[in-house]
Amino acid sequence: MAARRKCDRLIQDGEVRVDGEVVREPGTRVDPDVQRVTVGKRALPRLQAHAYFAFHKPVGVLTTMHDPGGRPTVKSYLPATGPRLFPVGRLDGDTSGLLLVTSDGELAHRLMHPRYEIPKTYHLTLSAPPSARALARLGMGVEFAPGESSRPARVETVRRGREGAVIALTIAEGRNRQVRRMCEALDLPLLALARVRVGPIELGDLAAGALRPLTGEEVTGLRNAVTGARASGEARRKPVTPGGVRRSRGGPPRRR
């Protein structure tokens, strides 16, 4: 591809054709995956379609494509051929669960941008059942450093017993080790942390270390989630009040 000004000149000189027809407007939109574009007598190669995957990151795997120390990374779980893939956002090494992987840089950037407030749901496995007060504080926002607090979140009890509990926490922000810092601030005995949902995409029964392609409907759902500036995310729209901690009737979310 040439520089912008040279491309504009080629268009104005009638050198560019789309499906055999001369194009003279520089702003003309084309779909290179469907339409045939030629410059002079040379046809432009079709662009490789983007790929979108859901990956169940195991504990101990780093969310990076290379580690100088030789520790396991997500790269070893990705296809060796096809478009260049990269993870969307990060999960700590000691956190498991859903990680989106794609070759679509623009969509990935939007999904990570705080402007769009994409909700993410985590399952917190606790070694002791939490008090109602602790759950209420978790939902209202937690101060984990002077002047630094989490925003209101959605809290649900997935399972609860004498020896522990599983709590579903949905947040629409992504500060460094935020969920773990929230638990530490409330003295919640966190045994394990797993992300089970990102926006409309659910982890479901995807096995640890497994990778599955997203459906067209799921990709559309992600694009819809980042179309235009969102005034608020799911977690902010449904803040939990002291009496508003919800109990889930079923088990972990299932992929639909």
Name these PLM-found stretches.
Residues M1-R256:
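Basic, flexible Lys/Arg- and Gly-enriched helix-loop patches that mediate nucleic-acid binding at interfaces
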